[in-house]
């Protein structure tokens, strides 16, 4: 037993040497009040289910303004031909209106056109499996409580993926908690109020439960972070099949590289 405790303490000491170099821009899929410092950039690659990859680049234009682009590819890993989500990249834009103080949260407004999963194109029906946030506003508040603890709540409206007729304003919330200087645990809930139709053209059955996601982030070095995330823990979506319905709970790996220019 003593050997096990000693081994755990040794691992903890080994993994507390590096910490995240900037406030998190996102939890798993929803934004926070964090922006990139001026003159920095991140290159991020998301490895998704079904062999999909989602690379993205974000730039710190000023300390309060971050701009990014992303481009999704399905079935990139595996055999056969891969499929592009779209022929052009999606856009992310964040502007911090108010800095966080001891008494007030930070306030960020933004735009994110990147949805989750595959982009589905049918006659009169064009959207991602999970809609993009669109325009949003998010409030973030952090507390130094045995390591940083951050709470985030926001509202969003998708102005682009509305062919299903569901144009409701949506809500999301989440938190991130430092375990030590290297590891952070994250969880989020997207109410999906604008994405709760029971059946979209027989492609996806939605149960109206929203999307519950969680993840673990490791700051491996000052420039590199790795994440393991679990999506749709609430099993909101099912994918009809000839014999069975498959739920959409899935795992993904995210690789984030941070640098100055």
Task: Give the residues covered by each predicted segment.
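Short, surface-exposed alpha-helical recognition segments that flank or form part
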Residues: 163
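Transmembrane beta-barrel domains of Gram-negative outer membranes and organellar outer membranes
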Residues: 17-149, 155-160, 176-261
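Sec-dependent N-terminal signal peptides
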Residues: 3-13
């Amino acid at each position: 037993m003593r050997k096990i405790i000693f081994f755990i303490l040794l691992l903890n000491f080994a993994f507390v040497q590096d910490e995240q170099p900037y406030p998190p821009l996102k939890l798993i899929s929803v934004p926070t009040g964090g922006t990139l410092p001026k003159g920095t950039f991140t290159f991020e690659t998301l490895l998704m289910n079904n062999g999909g990859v989602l690379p993205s680049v974000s730039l710190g234009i000023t300390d309060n303004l971050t701009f990014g682009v992303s481009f999704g590819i399905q079935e990139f890993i595996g055999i056969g031909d891969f499929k592009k989500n779209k022929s052009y990249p999606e856009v992310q834009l964040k502007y911090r209106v108010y800095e966080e103080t001891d008494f007030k949260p930070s306030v960020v407004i933004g735009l994110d056109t990147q949805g989750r999963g595959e982009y589905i194109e049918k006659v009169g029906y064009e959207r991602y499996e999970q809609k993009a946030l669109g325009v949003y506003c998010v409030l973030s508040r952090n507390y130094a409580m045995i390591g940083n603890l951050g709470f985030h709540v926001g509202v969003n409206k998708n102005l682009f993926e509305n062919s299903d007729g569901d144009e409701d304003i949506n809500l999301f919330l989440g938190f991130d908690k430092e375990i030590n200087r290297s590891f952070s645990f994250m969880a989020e809930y997207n109410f999906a109020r604008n994405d709760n139709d029971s059946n979209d053209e027989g492609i996806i059955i939605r149960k109206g439960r929203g999307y519950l996601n969680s993840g673990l982030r490791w700051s491996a070095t000052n420039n590199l972070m790795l994440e393991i995330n679990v999506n749709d823990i609430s099993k909101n979506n099912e994918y009809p099949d000839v014999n069975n319905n498959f739920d959409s709970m899935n795992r993904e790996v995210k690789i984030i590289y941070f640098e100055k220019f």
